[in-house]
């Protein structure tokens, strides 16, 4: 190939085409076999896998422009080779992983199977065989991320996983590269579109939780079994991955405290608005005094906060660093084409690295083994709704118990009594979780208490 001038994709008088590849113009000779072809295997042909295959066919010229090579998906690993998959030729389908692993022509493995096994085994074996890997598998990375990244580094192989956390939102590379000098101290993310859609409908249209979940299911945002979404497990895997990268320390899914949105009520939404807040399910990780906090739970955040404006199924990640201050990344966090587009971005990076012989994961000199702080030792403000007997002194007695256990009240509203029961809505100052729990246990034993209707953490220290 030679240097040339012209517009990308423009045919010259000699029958060649010129492409802009970075800052270099590349001339493609129209002779069979002249292109550098990178052969890949796609593991999984489901929603995202089929999207990746379709994009790889649509973007052939664009990929060559950006990398100087062409991509050929030589094999697609599926469970059932007899099943018709529109757009994917049957002759490239296989149910035999060993056939892919032992094929020396295949340089790149694109893992889109989901689940921990056999995906983890396939990723490990691919890296051990010297193959580059792109994956969107948050389950594997949240459980075995450090093991896999260390293996990639030691074997001199690429592993890219931008799509594993927030779909089309670019956050993995910024955490590893652009923000590497920012001294990050906190990440907060709306990283589950299903729960954000549900909470948006509850807030804006007055739906209760069951109505909003039914609507999310109808639109395809929620699975038939929504447990992983609504209980915070999906967000927990994503915040574990981001925490590991941000603080260069091992954080796994089992380290994450998780609390979902199933107990959020219309009353919680309404009272939050009265105080100037909206409720979001957030993944949060902080580095405080050499210890990592990592958790997922609903939170009241001020209406003026950037995350408060993230609606429906959109995702967003908000980061704070001592050097960079605040930054937010927002976009589609899931879906066939948004996720496939993030996978394609990773594929293009790996292809470019193969062409320039620059493969390999660089995780840094060493991991910092920061301990993960137990949830009982973290601090938060709290929103607390109590149903109490409508008797003189009830509020004073409860305030006294809270105060005696280091729980200071920042705001309190007493709602009109009904049938001899009054509702107290309290927002506390920042308090240790264990002190708050100790106080709550005592309050639950008080004769004036009828019910604890809601407990939600509040943004701010």
Residue ranges and their predicted role:
Residues 347-461:
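A conserved regulatory-domain signal marking ACT and ACT-like small-molecule sensing domains
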Residues 184-188, 196-199, 203, 215, ...:
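Catalytic, metal-anchored helix/loop core of enzyme active sites in primary metabolism
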Residues 27, 32-129:
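N-terminal glycine-/serine-/threonine-rich beta1-alpha1-beta2 phosphate-ribose binding loop
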Residues 211-309, 314-316:
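Substrate-binding/catalytic subdomain of NAD(P)-dependent oxidoreductase enzymes
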Residues 6-8, 15, 20-24:
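Short hydrophobic alpha-helical segments enriched in small aliphatic residues
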């Amino acid at each position: 190939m030679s240097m040339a001038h012209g517009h990308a994709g423009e045919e010259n008088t000699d029958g060649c085409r010129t492409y802009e590849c970075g800052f270099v113009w590349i001339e493609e000779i129209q002779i069979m076999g002249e292109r550098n072809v990178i052969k890949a295997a796609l593991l999984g042909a489901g929603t995202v896998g089929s999207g990746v295959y379709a994009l790889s066919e649509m973007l052939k010229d664009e990929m060559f422009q950006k990398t100087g090579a062409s991509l050929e998906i030589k094999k697609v690993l599926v469970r059932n080779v007899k099943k018709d998959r529109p757009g994917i030729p049957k002759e490239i389908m296989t149910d035999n992983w060993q056939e892919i692993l032992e094929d020396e022509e295949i340089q790149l493995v694109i893992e889109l199977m989901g689940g921990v096994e056999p995906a983890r085994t396939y990723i490990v074996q691919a890296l051990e065989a010297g193959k580059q890997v792109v994956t969107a598998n948050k389950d594997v990375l949240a459980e075995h991320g450090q093991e896999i990244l260390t293996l990639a580094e030691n074997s001199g192989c690429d592993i890219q996983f931008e799509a594993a956390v927030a779909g089309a939102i670019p956050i993995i590379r910024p955490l590893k590269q652009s923000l590497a000098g920012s001294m990050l101290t906190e990440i907060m993310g709306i990283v589950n579109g299903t729960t954000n859609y549900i909470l948006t409908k509850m807030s804006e249209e007055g739906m209760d939780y069951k109505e909003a979940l039914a609507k999310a299911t109808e639109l395809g945002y929620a699975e038939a079994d929504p447990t992983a979404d609504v209980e915070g497990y999906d967000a927990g895997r994503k915040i574990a991955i981001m925490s590991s990268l941000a603080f260069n320390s091992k954080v796994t899914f089992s380290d994450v405290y998780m609390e979902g949105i199933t107990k959020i009520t219309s009353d919680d939404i309404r009272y939050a608005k009265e105080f100037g807040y909206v409720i979001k399910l957030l993944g949060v990780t902080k580095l405080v005094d050499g210890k990592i906090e990592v958790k997922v739970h609903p939170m009241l955040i001020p209406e003026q906060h950037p995350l408060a404006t993230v609606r429906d199924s959109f995702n967003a990640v908000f980061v704070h660093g001592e050097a960079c201050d605040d930054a937010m990344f927002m976009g589609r966090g899931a879906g066939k084409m948004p996720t496939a587009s993030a996978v394609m971005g990773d594929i293009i990076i790996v292809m470019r690295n193969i062409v320039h012989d620059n493969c390999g994961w660089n995780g840094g000199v060493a991991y910092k083994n920061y301990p993960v702080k137990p949830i009982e030792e973290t601090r938060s403000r709290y929103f607390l709704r109590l149903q109490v007997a409508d008797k003189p002194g009830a509020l004073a007695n409860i305030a006294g118990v809270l105060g005696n256990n280091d729980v200071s009240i920042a705001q309190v509203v007493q709602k009109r009594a009904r049938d001899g029961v009054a509702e107290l809505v309290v927002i506390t100052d920042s308090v240790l979780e264990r002190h708050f729990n100790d106080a709550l246990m005592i309050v639950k034993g008080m004769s004036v208490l009828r019910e604890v209707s809601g407990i939600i953490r509040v943004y701010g220290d």
